[in-house]
Design a protein with these regions (language model features):
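Short acidic/polar inter-strand loop motif in beta-rich domains
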Residues: 235-241, 370-377
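Extracellular recognition modules
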Residues: 230-232, 364-368
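Accessory beta-strand-rich segments of carbohydrate-active enzymes
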Residues: 16-28, 32, 40, 63-64, ...
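Beta-strand-rich binding/interaction modules
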Residues: 199, 282-332
Length: 384
């Protein structure tokens, strides 16, 4: 095992990023997609991409499909398309809404492509390719973005008829009984370009930024049995001025959708930085962990600790991982107010296998959050 060093530092709660909001809203105003000052509502702030697992054995798989706390929502969804916002279905998010006349599509998809018919007809609008221009009417001048995305273009514009397409999606899902008592999140890995989300008729939030994950804590809105998820996607929003580069502009839920679960007391974020000495013979793994508690039962939790284990596993192998280093932190106290408790940990590895193009190699870091009795509260993992 490698030499270990641990320190813990309490920090104040992270300020919300500008443009993110979390106040209670019954319904959206409907103008968020053309409000540059509003970036997201109800959406988790950016963090590292990793998952919770039930056991260390699961965690060594790293990928979400290996986890008991992951459920894919890909597959059949009900779908309704309109060419302009004023034509959209207003109350489709209500659980009792009858969507039997809607089409059934397979998510992930880009609706322009999905709607191409064998006879050449376009059921869900036109795929648009542009280099550095935006598909809606604009002018190259200072502050032109203030004119928005709904200006009337010349008649030869593809978007003259369909000024800003809107796709409405609906599906039902059930949460595993084994997730009871945990925080449940719905995750959208890519939605072009703006969307609202409702669960069981309750407004959850919205997101801009097509190419990054958008996660929402939907725990307060869930019920036992069948739940209804509704999503309304807009082709363009004020952020589309920034998402303009050499590519096809294809709206829709174009990447995976999933449910994930984490305990109320959790490893919220993780930063892992490897470092080598001048000889490349000695490595240090610097780990920064953001711990948080959203438990309503306890005001604070005493005696928590973190245990990190580093496993060696050659690339492309699924079995045979060997533990090469381990570190356990000192005990700490965590308040149940959602504020972060930052823990920094260092792990030493002698004669590490180095990554190269000729002989790629990677390690698996497994983290376990322990209570004062040594019981595992959460297990996470990542490649390094």
């Amino acid at each position: 095992m490698g030499l270990t060093l641990t320190t813990s530092v309490a920090m104040q709660a992270q300020a919300n990023l500008k443009g993110f909001s979390y106040d209670k809203q019954e319904q959206p105003t409907g103008q968020e997609w053309q409000s540059p000052e509003a970036y997201a509502h109800g959406k988790l702030q950016p963090r590292a991409h990793f998952y919770s697992f039930k056991t260390v054995s699961e965690a060594l798989g790293v990928l979400p499909e290996k986890s008991s706390y992951y459920q894919s929502l890909n597959g059949a969804w009900r779908f309704h398309w309109v060419g302009n916002p004023e034509e959209r279905e207003v109350n489709f998010f209500k659980p009792e809404y009858n969507d039997e006349k809607w089409d059934t599509v397979n998510v992930p998809m880009s609706w322009n492509i999905y709607g191409l018919q064998k006879d050449g007809k376009q059921k869900y609008g036109t795929p648009i390719y542009l280099n550095q221009r935006v598909p809606f009417f604009h002018q190259v001048k200072v502050d032109d973005w203030k004119g928005g995305v709904m200006r009337t273009p010349p008649e030869n514009y593809t978007m003259y008829k369909h000024r800003n397409e809107v796709g409405a999606y609906r599906r039902t899902f059930s949460v595993p009984s084994s997730w009871e008592g945990q925080s449940v999140y719905v995750n959208f890995d890519g939605v072009d370009s703006f969307f609202y989300i409702w669960v069981n008729g309750h407004y959850v939030g919205f997101s801009k930024n097509s190419r990054n994950r958008a996660s929402f804590d939907i725990s307060p809105y869930l019920k036992q049995g069948e739940n209804t998820l509704a999503v309304e996607v807009y082709r363009n929003n004020d952020g589309s001025f920034l998402e303009s580069q050499d590519m096809f502009r294809l709206p829709g839920i174009f990447r995976s959708v999933s449910l994930t679960a984490k305990p109320k007391v959790q490893i919220h974020d993780l930063q892992v930085t490897p470092d080598l000495d001048a000889t490349y013979q000695h490595a240090t793994l610097n780990i920064k962990t953001d711990l948080r508690s959203y438990s309503s039962k306890l005001k604070q939790l005493k005696g928590l600790s973190l245990r990190y284990s580093l496993y060696s596993l050659p690339l492309y192998l699924d079995e045979g991982a060997k533990r090469v280093a381990e570190v356990q932190s000192e005990a700490l106290t965590l308040k149940s107010d959602g504020a972060p408790q930052m823990l920094t940990t260092s792990m030493s590895v002698e004669s590490p296998n180095l990554w190269s193009a000729e002989a790629p190699y990677r390690y698996i870091l497994v983290g376990e959050l322990l209570d004062k009795k040594g019981n595992v509260l959460e297990t996470v993992s990542t490649y390094t």
